[in-house]
């Protein structure tokens, strides 16, 4: 039986497995080998940031490459290491730093999937004659054929809601989805760990990757300051009502919705409401000023069955949306008009930051289809806060 939905025997089906050196991709390789597929393991060397290479929970660095090699030896498949460090720096690390300089809060994992993994590695898999590229992501794909595209597939949330990675995969294109396979989509993480133990894999008890892989000890500001010194320039901390409350040592130390460590006190709780990168101002205000009901999107990747503009015009497209990875999908309407493509959130969200993602779904449950999404370009707050912010941004900045 071909579990990957190909009309041929497993032994006649070549699969490249993207192996990060973690337990998930290792188990994928082991499962496919057991099922009789022609499996090749490929690990990408993406960066070498000193301490990050040996940091527990990093990925695609020195120790992880060695772990992937040992796993491949155990299960009996070839293993290759490709040096993508330059490509990773150009398409992931540099844009990450530039996004922070612009006052955004980026998601480099999405950029990595978009470029290095699902573009470059996928192309390499095809050059090797593989029928599919398999990964250890927790997401499901199923056949969704049409008359013009009999091999078309669709994405769905995974069985293990706690491991749902669909938010980070919203930008996966239809062509990539048709070629990719996600064997862990229907499996809880506990079962993955148990399989790793059963297979005798060296990574069975290895900790899951945490934070951003190329950031040593999770200190984003150190990496950004090194790559983009302008992000560390001092500026004003300003209240929405126009009062200058103090000064900061660089907008790279702040993100929308932040409360702790702002550096000023007024007696009332204050939150970061906006990062004015042009004037190097950190704008703060009360919690209610964070309430967001509309987000405008850029770089939209639409995975619905009808064309985007056709679906989103007029009354809009009723769906569910996530504006942060840890939140469940909430009711929303996708719209398109002369102002662009945007999502109206039925239930307001606090602390929505530009640069983050808005992923779209068919339903709120674990079996929901993924309709794609886009990066948040800007958001609209409740009317009074929005008016105050616009007035403040239009005012001159003291020299």
Curated annotation (Swiss-Prot):
Its main location: cytoplasm. It comes from the Bacteria. Its EC number is 2.8.1.13. HAMAP family: tRNA_thiouridyl_MnmA. The active site is at residues 112, 213. PANTHER family: MITOCHONDRIAL TRNA-SPECIFIC 2-THIOURIDYLASE 1, TRNA 5-METHYLAMINOMETHYL-2-THIOURIDYLATE -METHYLTRANSFERASE. GO terms for molecular function: ATP binding; tRNA binding; tRNA-uridine 2-sulfurtransferase activity. Catalyzes the 2-thiolation of uridine at the wobble position (U34) of tRNA, leading to the formation of s(2)U34. This is tRNA-specific 2-thiouridylase MnmA. ATP binds at residues 18-25, 44, 136. Belongs to the MnmA/TRMU family. It is found in: Cytoplasm. It catalyses: S-sulfanyl-L-cysteinyl-[protein] + uridine(34) in tRNA + AH2 + ATP = 2-thiouridine(34) in tRNA + L-cysteinyl-[protein] + A + AMP + diphosphate + H(+). Disulfide bonds join 112-213. GO terms for biological process: tRNA wobble position uridine thiolation. The record marks 137, 356 as: Interaction with tRNA. It is an enzyme of class 2 (transferase). GO terms for cellular component: cytoplasm. Gene3D superfamilies: Adenine nucleotide alpha hydrolases-like domains, HUPs, Translation factors. Transmembrane segments: none annotated. Residues 163-165 are annotated as: Interaction with tRNA.
């Amino acid at each position: 039986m071909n579990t990957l939905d190909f009309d041929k025997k497993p032994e006649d089906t070549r699969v490249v497995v993207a192996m990060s050196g973690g337990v998930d991709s290792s188990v994928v390789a082991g499962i496919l080998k057991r099922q009789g597929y022609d499996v090749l393991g490929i690990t990408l060397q993406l960066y070498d940031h000193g301490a990050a290479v040996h940091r527990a929970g990093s990925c695609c660095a020195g120790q992880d490459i060695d772990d992937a090699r040992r796993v491949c030896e155990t299960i009996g498949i070839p293993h290759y290491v490709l040096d993508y460090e330059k490509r990773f720096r150009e398409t992931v690390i540099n844009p990450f730093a530039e996004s922070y300089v612009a006052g955004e809060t980026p998601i480099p994992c999405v950029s990595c999937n978009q470029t290095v993994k699902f573009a470059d590695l996928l192309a390499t898999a095809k050059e090797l004659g593989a029928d599919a590229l398999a990964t250890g992501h927790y997401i499901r794909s199923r056949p969704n054929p049409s008359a013009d595209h009999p091999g078309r597939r669709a994405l769905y949330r995974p069985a293990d809601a706690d491991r749902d990675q669909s938010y980070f995969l919203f930008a996966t294109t239809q062509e990539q989805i048709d070629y990719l396979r996600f064997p862990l989509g229907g499996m809880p993480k506990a079962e993955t760990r148990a399989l790793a133990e059963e297979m005798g894999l060296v990574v069975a008890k290895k900790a899951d990757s945490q934070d951003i892989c190329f950031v040593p000890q999770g200190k984003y500001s150190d990496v950004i300051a090194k790559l983009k010194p302008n992000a560390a320039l001092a500026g004003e901390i300003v209240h929405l009502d126009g009062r200058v409350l103090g000064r900061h040592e660089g907008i790279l130390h702040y993100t929308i919705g932040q409360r702790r460590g702002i550096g000023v006190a007024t007696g009332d709780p204050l939150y970061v409401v906006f990062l004015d990168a042009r004037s190097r101002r950190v704008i703060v205000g009360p919690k209610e000023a964070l309430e967001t009901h509309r987000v405008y999107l850029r770089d939209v990747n639409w995975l619905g069955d009808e064309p985007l503009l056709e679906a989103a015009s007029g009354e809009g497209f009723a769906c569910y949306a996530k504006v942060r990875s840890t939140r469940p999908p909430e009711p929303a309407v996708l719209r398109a008009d002369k102002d662009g493509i945007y999502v109206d959130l039925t239930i307001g969200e606090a602390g929505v930051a530009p640069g983050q993602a808005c992923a779209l779904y068919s339903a709120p449950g674990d079996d929901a289809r993924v309709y794609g999404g886009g990066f948040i370009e800007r958001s609209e707050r409740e009317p009074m806060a929005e008016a105050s912010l616009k007035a403040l941004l239009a005012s001159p900045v003291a020299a």
